Amino acid sequence: MTSYSFTEKKRIRKDFGKQRSILEVPFLLAIQVDSYREFLQEDVEPNKRKDLGLHAALKSVFPISSYSGNAALEYVGYKLGQPVFDERECRQRGMSYGAPLRVTVRLVIYDRESSTKAIKYVKEQEVYLGEIPLMTGNGTFIVNGTERVIVSQLHRSPGVFFDHDRGKTHSSGKLLYSARIIPYRGSWLDFEFDPKDALFTRIDRRRKLPVSILLRALGYSNEEMLAEFFEINTFHINPDEGVQLELVPERLRGETLNFDLADGDKVIVEAGKRITARHVKQLEAAGVAALAVPDDYLVGRILSHDVVDGSTGELLANANDEINEDQLAAFRKAGVDAVGTLWVNDLDRGPYLSNTLRIDPTKTQLEALVEIYRMMRPGEPPTKEAAQNLFHNLFFTFERYDLSTVGRMKFNRRVGRKDVLGESVLYDKKYFAERNDEESKRLVAEHADTSDILEVIKVLTEIRNGRGVVDDIDHLGNRRVRSVGEMAENVFRVGLVRVERAVKERLSMAESEGLTPQELINAKPVAAAIKEFFGSSQLSQFMDQNNPLSEVTHKRRVFALGPGGLTRERAGFEVRDVHPTHYGRVCTIETPEGPNIGLINSLAVFARTNQYGFLETPYRKVLDGKVSDDVEYLSAIEENEYVIAQANALTDAKNMLTEQFVPCRFQGESLLKPPSEVHFMDVSPMQTVSVAAALVPFLEHDDANRALMGANMQRQAVPTLRSQKPLVGTGIERAVARDSGVTVNALRGGVIEQIDAARIVVKVNEAEIGGGTDAGVDIYNLIKYTRSNQNTCINQRPLVNVGDVIARGDVLADGPSTDIGELALGQNMLIAFMPWNGYNFEDSILLSERVVEEDRYTTIHIEELTCVARDTKLGPEEISADIPNVSEQALNRLDESGVVYIGAEVRAGDIMVGKVTPKGESQLTPEEKLLRAIFGEKASDVKDSSLRVPPGMDGTVIDVQVFTRDGIEKDKRARQIEENEIKRVKKDFDDQFRILEAAIYARLRSQIVGKVANGGANLKKGDTVTDAYLDGLKKSDWFQLRMKDEDAADAIERAQKQIQAHEKEFEARFADKRGKITQGDDLAPGVLKMVKVFLAVKRRIQPGDKMAGRHGNKGVVSNVVPVEDMPYMATGESVDIVLNPLGVPSRMNIGQILEVHLGWAAKGLGRKIQRMLEAQAAVSELRKFLNDIYNHDNAINAQRVDLSQFSDEELLNLGKNLIDGVPMATPVFDGASEAEIKRMLELADLPQSGQTQLYDGRTGEAFDRKTTVGYMHYLKLNHLVDDKMHARSTGPYSLVTQQPLGGKAQFGGQRFGEMEVWALEAYGAAYTLQEMLTVKSDDVQGRNQMYKNIVDGEHEMVAGMPESFNVLVKEIRSLAINMELEE
């Protein structure tokens, strides 16, 4: 039995899950938080830091040596400072939340004269390397005041990949195989076959070269190449006639000989017959070692080596020549005893490299190097050194080429090596053996005779020969996840490399000019690279903050797009499709609809990344059919070897698999296996899906397409005024709310001491109090009415009362869309499935007026409006209430500084901040200037540029912030805001100090009461300290007490030290805060003052708003009907929402029907509990009823609730919280069965069919048949008609065409397009059409004249020349065709 926490005891979900949970839902933001923690390694001592993140980047670039080698800059360590502003201040001020990075570097100068590089002097110094953004506790970054998320990227893993072109390149449809070595950074190396079976290579996708050029550049000769790739047949040449072949029978298979193959007299294969495997076996049995063959058998074979005349040294034939009869004769003449030929055939030993050598124009290593140089740098004259350096820098230097540990691991596994470790550059035995620098010697010593490039070519030729298979690039073993930390490290390294170049230049001057490390290093490139990445990278995204779920999902996104990834246009169907390896790693359901489908994925609930960045998923071990609770994480590569059973495989009480054949997965296929052959078993049924999909109850009954929409639309739900937990959930709601960070969770257990709307104070348990100055008080400040990124309202409200005993992790306050610590995205509505007068045609939704009345779907949106006063060429703009040509009434909401009051209710067009801008159309004469100066007539030379409420918006001002540039005097409003803020901070600190002080005194009291004192105020030696005595003593005099007991004396001293320390700390913190509040603000260049006004807009639900359930059942509100007209039940209760039943069968999302049934039962049970409580039934009766609800199922794994843990008071409290409905959980793929739903309906005294008789609210008549009625959790989505409705009378025009702009943001018009013109033409409405095309659009004079006419009361129009016609004339003239209009 589980024990329940303080929060969980308030309301318990009835869980229908049959599978015992082996693993708790892991921390959902781990992928972000852990990755960045490893990048910073902030809490790790410098000497213990792992080779990761910042540390690795710094180590890889340093030491930097000067060109002469006389000076070097070495890296010692780094540390991060304290952030200047905390998270809240950064959001408010529009700053980035980060900490300064200080790197300790050592400048070493060597003595030039000394031969042994003696050190002349060393200087160590801390250098500032820019700000490093810090991650908030919730996995976000604050960049320029907005919260952003760096999403993870799924990219192709470094390593080597083999593929073919699927027969698309050549018209014959022949498969052309290719290999590609992809490093983490550096040049790509490709190998490919052409249709004629020659092998080519490309570097960085440039033009192709025969592969032998690359091998020759590595130092291989023709003979060595052939020896590496071919087995050799040896022929002994008889002096007069015939040839003896050294026989390897296997090599004859598939050949047809033109002579009898005999062993002595016994003919094994007749001439002209093909040699089969049976013949080969006979030859092996007979032990034939040599075979006499005629000369023509040797002619046409390919030589494996150069043939030289032993006596004269004359070259008779080259390696790779085809032997002809003349050469054979020459061999005989020169007395050549034996020649070697390549063993090739058409079956499985292709002569590919031999073919390639024939088209290779180069003969020496140098020629090959020059050829590569010409291909890489066309047009540059090659020199020997340049060619060698270029080639070496391509693949063999650590600076330019890095396979990375992942790449090396993948490479070695693919070419069949046992060892997964190795160098991060490509290694070749021949190439490095010929070089004689230290690095090459080390490599040769460690890796003797391996050759990366040769092995890749060997594997490729084997695949071409029909042995081996190509790779599947969509397999998750070939794609890895790059998370925040790794991307930040790469960007940081790029910045450092830029610095490195500059430092190298300066290092040569360091010695002569006595420069310090600080003067050598310029931090700007590093800071710029980091800023650019966090501010504008494709993977740094504006956080989706609609509701807690959208935050969590955004942080768990996996993007295939972005730098180094795919592009939308080039991504084909295969990349986007669901792959068998996605199982348990990437959600198979949640992905956006539209052009990004399949490219943006979500991590599965239990997925995590391993040290190489591959996604892995947990499985339970199975041994001999017994399922254990040991969990092992497997990546897609490892999983390939195992047979894995489903999570719902049947087991008995001893955890043995009971079925004769268990449904399993093996290598991406589904099959049945006996229990003894099963290796692993899924951990949980929801293993395959992401968090959003796991929140859809009865997901297993929904069609996948609709489930996708359901998962996606939950992220768009707007937090309502009062959250309501879903009656039918899946049991994962609590985990999502906990990890999203919107709730306030207790850091330590204790007792609630003080509470108000904005703050909770907890007195911590003795056991959890740390040493030192820890006074055992935790203070939680709640977030009140703050704007989210999506303009929804973030507000936290307390859940606890004074005196409540809480434990660590308990929920103290709810945030947006949470209800007692559970995710609550919408409202539970009473729903009927029936048509109603066409108002639910095409998925429309009919609402009851009661829904609007009770504010069930009322949401608060907070809009931020900004007014900026700049310094212009004509003088500064000014924020003031003195605005020309504006009525008094328009200014009555502004104070004397010209800023709107808090609490003012404003509508579209109202002035929020008065601002005037100097206008300088008239040049003043000196006389006028003098008069102006004397009389100060100012109104005429400024224009009104005030901040007004945008069209279509109204609301209440809830906050105003004024930012003033440093050095400019603050106005009255700014000073007032500043004073209020200082007062608030002071009160906050005073309260905190008072609470801490009280806690310290209370602890001290418990330690000294009843102890004997040696003296003190009004105390004699030997007196006992009592409570009454302490009550009468001034607090400060407590420290005068001298105790006999050592411990008590220590306690007094400790308490005094604690109070003094806290007092000092609070004073310092207050001074710091005060300084921050009073200092000027860091504004953009040219900005003098900035005013931000926050408007709270209340939006009720109305026709045109989009709503949805959790099963992809979306629709638009068509009408809001009075309560009395809605269909009602026999009890008189009318329904809230009427949905169209036709929306269900074709969409196949039956989950919504089951949810409605179970929701009705949940509500019915709640009503039954309410009746019990109202009748004041005995607690035992309530306990029995709750036991019936929670523990009715006697299956082995049924989830049970131990009600004996609850005291009577707790049970009554639980009962009260269940009045609104008993919440149920039906986990995905493991949900409630039909029988269980029926049982719940029966318990609630409701019809088991889930249907009831409804009556028409307007006539009172019963409908013809019974209707499905019940409760569904229904959401209001962030597609509100208020944001989309828009109308224009007059507004801005396009500069060139003079036509009205388009779109709501530009206050544009509606386009009267080509088809609409046809419609008017068809009706013959010529005058209407003329009006549309001229005065209502782009006839500039006509429209101005028309305005005048309307003002004058004359209703007539004269259509003139449309401006677009003039544009057309100008465009034709630009083609040198003159066109003129004649009167």
Swiss-Prot record:
Catalysis performed (reactions): RNA(n) + a ribonucleoside 5'-triphosphate = RNA(n+1) + diphosphate
Catalytic activity, EC: 2.7.7.6
UniProt-recorded Gene Ontology molecular function terms: DNA binding; DNA-directed RNA polymerase activity; ribonucleoside binding
Family annotation (SUPFAM superfamilies): beta and beta-prime subunits of DNA dependent RNA-polymerase
Domain of life: Bacteria
Gene Ontology CC entries for this record: DNA-directed RNA polymerase complex
GO biological process terms held by the UniProt record: DNA-templated transcription
Keywords: DNA-directed RNA polymerase, Nucleotidyltransferase, Transcription, Transferase
NCBIfam families tied to this protein: PRK00405.1, rpoB
Subunit description: The RNAP catalytic core consists of 2 alpha, 1 beta, 1 beta' and 1 omega subunit. When a sigma factor is associated with the core the holoenzyme is formed, which can initiate transcription.
Protein family per UniProt: Belongs to the RNA polymerase beta chain family.
Free-text function comment from the UniProt entry: DNA-dependent RNA polymerase catalyzes the transcription of DNA into RNA using the four ribonucleoside triphosphates as substrates.
Protein name: DNA-directed RNA polymerase subunit beta
Taxonomic lineage from the root: Bacteria, Pseudomonadati, Pseudomonadota, Gammaproteobacteria, Lysobacterales
